[in-house]
Amino acid sequence: MQSKLVALLIIVLSFGGCTSKNSDENSSGKIKAAVSILPMKFIAEQIGGDKIDISVIIPNGSDPHTFDPSSKTIKKVHDSDVYFKIGGTFVFEKNIISDLQSNDISKFVDCSKGISFIENDPHIWLGMDESKIIASNIASKLIRIDSKNEQFYKSNLNIFNQKVDSLKSVVHERLSDLSNRKILVYHPAWRYFLSQFNLIEESVEKDGKHPKAGDLRQIINQSNEQNINAIFIEEQFNPDAAKSIAHELNIPIIKVNPLTENLFFEWNNFSVKIKERAN
């Protein structure tokens, strides 16, 4: 991985003298931004609107834990005016972006600034409160780059925050009377979201690995005692990984998408599915 990364970096830097970046910027008049995943694009679009063009580095349907970028993908980062990082321990950014950042630190914005991480869990975009902090960090950078449109970005940030708060109230009312506050997920991605509604995430995966037979038996026994009524698995994962648990507990496997293109939809969708299984 490291040898390939070095080769990619050499290829990227070799484009430096012949890139058409400046002509692209002048013709479009837009800020060229890059992000790691679709949810970050969603937040950035809410703030930047038609003032920015956004490249998503990890394609829809790919697993960020295993994604291996091409030289063309890395060049997108190189050619961008700004890269909105998730920050923290997000694996793709730790493995790839950190090396690129050393060449142009001013380009990279750590959107986790101001967020208190839960046990180094990188899935901050799924927390409704955390998404507002991410949006604020994006707005601050866009204002520094494009100060003449400061009010545009501030207004969009206000609108985004109001939408998040409004949906959060709906979700809170929907989930407030659940008798079972524990939610079983395959991959531990939802703590930021669930904790804001006093729900507890129980995960099958530990440290990115499927449990061994003894640990799996313990999870099944605990889930049975806790009256777990569903197992939620990410669309990017093979549902076969959860089948043995679902079969033993006689519960359904329900797909959710932490890498959604529309956070408003997925927050609402996940909460509806939790509520449906509670009835």
Segments and roles (model prediction):
Residues 18-279:
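Extracytoplasmic metal-acquisition and chelation regions
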Residues 1-16:
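Sec-dependent bacterial lipoprotein signal peptides
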